Amino acid sequence: MSSVGIASASLWLRGPVKSALKGRWLSCEQMRRYGTKSAPAVRKGGHSKKARQAPSLPFVFGRHKQLTGPEFTRRTRIGNLSDKITKFEQLKLLPEVREVMMKVIASESVLNKSLDDEDCGLDDKRVAAFLGQVQPTPIQTAVIKKMAKTLMEPQLQVHMVAAETGSGKTMSYLMPLVDYLKQEEQAAGTEEGRARLGALRSLILVPTHELVEQVYMTLEKLQEPLQLKTFKLDRDTPYKDIVEAFKGRVDIMVTTPGKLRGLFKIRMLHRPDRILSQVRFAVVDEADTLMDQSWVQETYSCIKSLRDANHLVFCSASVPMEFEKAMNKLFPNLQVVASEKLHRINKHSNIKIINVALRPYNGSKMKALAQALYAIMKDGTSEGYEKRCVVFVNEADSVNSIVDTLRDKFGHDVHGLTGEHSLDDRLATIAPFMRSPPRIQDQVRPSELKKPQERRLPNSNIKVADSKDNGQRSVSSPLKVLVTTDVLSRGINFKGVKHVILYDVPAKSIDLVHRVGRTSRMNERGHVYIFVGKKGSAQAKGLNPVVKKNRPIQ
C-alpha cells in the first residue's frame, strides 16, 4: 500500500473513531462504517476515483499477526525502476559477469520452455536461443542498482533483501557478489596480488542441506567461465577435502551455520578463525529462519567470525515482525530493499477450496486428495510433459501413510520426504522435481480429441473434463507426486510444479506464504488446492479475493 493511501486513511479517521482504533489496521467492515462518512469533501475534478478508494488492507491469516505489514516495504521504494530498467545492460556490472550470469539464468529459468530434465550447459543452443528473453526482475534491478553505488567501499554494509517467493532473489545477491569478487581481482592486478586475496573470499549460509545442494548447482556453472573456485561444505564432505580446499583459495563457499561452526572441531585445519576473518562478502539466505530463536545464536556466532567483512546480505521471502525487530537491534544501520509484492500471493495462483466435511468426502481427506489428483491428471494442461504436484502436511507422521495409500490403492507415482530421511535419500527424492519436466512421447494430445464437457467436483470449485465424453478417451498426463512437510516449503526452486495441495491448513501465515510459493514462480500460472473442514473454511475461502485484490498476508 502506498504512503499516499496511508495518509488518506489517516485523514479519514476523525475524533473518537481514531482514538478508539488506536492506530490498528481497519477491517473491511470498519472501513465501510467509518471511512466514507468522515472523508473530506472532494472538489469536482480534484481527485481521481482511484485516489478515493480505500487502501488495500492486510489479510490476517491464523489467530495472530505474524508478518510485517505494508509499512515495512515502504522503508525502500523500488517504484518504477522495473519500467525504466528492462535489460541487464542497463545495470552496473562487469561485462564478463553480466554475460555469464545471463546464461546461468537462461539455463535455469522455468520460463525457458525448451529445457527438459537433462542437464543444460551454458553453451547449449537452448540457452543461446533464450538469452534475448532474459530480463532482470524488479528485485534484481533494485538490489544490483543499490549495491553497485558503494560496492567496493571498504566499510561494512548490511543489507536486507526481502521479496516474494519465486522472484529471483538468489540471482539478486549472486550478481553483486560475483561482481565484487571479479572487481577485487582486477584491483589486485598481478597473479601474486590475487594470491593474497584470502583462503575464503565469500560465504553463503542456508538453513538446510537441500538448499546447499541447490545453490551449489548454480555456483558450479560459474567456475569455468569466470575462473572462480566454488566449494560446498555439507554433511558428507570429508575432512581431507576441506583441508585441501583451504590450502588453495575458495572464492565462494555455501554451507549451513552448523557445518561452518564445525570447522573449529577439525584438528587438521589450521586456524579456522583466520580463514573466516578473510571473508569479504557474506550472504544469509532464508534469513528469517536462520535468525529465529532456534538458530539465531549459531548464526550470529558465524557472523561475528567474519571480522573484516565488507558486505553482509540477509535475504528472505518473508519478514516476521520478531525478525524485523531483531535485525534492527543487531544492525542499526541496516539497509532494506523490499519488494512491494512481499507477503502477497502471486496473482497467477488459482486458489481452489475443497470442503472435506461435506459430501461425498464426509470428512475423508484421502478421498478428497485422490479426487484432486485425478482432476489434475485429467485437466488437459501441460500437453506432452510430465506433471508435478507437491502435497504439504503439518505432521511428519502423516507422510508415510498418505504415500502408501496413494501408491497401493490408487497407483500413483508418489514419494514422501521428511526431515527424518537421510540427506542422500532427500536429495534423490527431490532431484526430479528440481529439473524441468520431461517430454512424454506417447501422450494423447488434447488437440486430437473432441473438446470434453466440463463438470465440477462435489463441494469444491474444481472443474475437470468429463471422462464420459461420448466414449472418447479423456486426456491424461503422467503425474509425479511429492508428499512432504514444511521442510521443503522454503527456498527450494521446484521446476514445473504447477499444482500444490495443502492437505492440512497451516496454522501460521508465514507457512501459508511459503507453501503456496512453491508454484506460480516467476509469474507462471499455478494451482493451489486447500483442504478445509468445519473449522477455518471461512478464512480459507477469503484467500481468493485476497489474491485478486493483491492484498498482503499478515
UniProtKB/Swiss-Prot annotation:
Top-level taxon of the source organism: Eukaryota
Domain note for this entry? Answer: The Q motif is unique to and characteristic of the DEAD box family of RNA helicases and controls ATP binding and hydrolysis.
Keywords attached to this entry: ATP-binding, Helicase, Hydrolase, Mitochondrion, Nucleotide-binding, RNA-binding, Transit peptide
Which residues are the transit peptide here? Answer: 1-54
Q: What class of enzyme is it?
A: hydrolase
Query: Basic and acidic residues: which segments have biased composition?
Result: 445-457
**What does the similarity note say?**
Belongs to the DEAD box helicase family. MRH4 subfamily.
* Residue intervals of the Helicase ATP-binding domain: 150-337
Q: Quick one: which residues bind ATP? A: 163-170
**GO MF terms held by the record:** ATP binding; ATP hydrolysis activity; mitochondrial ribosomal large subunit rRNA binding; RNA helicase activity
Protein task: ATP-binding RNA helicase involved in mitochondrial RNA metabolism. Required for maintenance of mitochondrial DNA.
Q: Name one GO cellular component term.
A: nucleolus
| Residue positions of motif Q motif | 119-140
Region of interest called Disordered, as start-end residue ranges on this chain? 439-474
Supply the source organism's classification: Eukaryota, Fungi, Dikarya, Ascomycota, Saccharomycotina
Which residue ranges does the record assign to the Helicase C-terminal domain? 368-554
Q: Some GO term, biological process aspect, for this entry: which one?
A: maturation of LSU-rRNA from tricistronic rRNA transcript (SSU-rRNA, 5.8S rRNA, LSU-rRNA)
Q: Which Gene3D superfamilies would you find in this protein's record?
A: P-loop containing nucleotide triphosphate hydrolases
Motif DEAD box per record, residues: 285-288
Per the UniProt entry, the Enzyme Commission number(s) are: 3.6.4.13
Q: List the protein's name.
A: ATP-dependent RNA helicase MRH4, mitochondrial
Where in or outside the cell? Mitochondrion
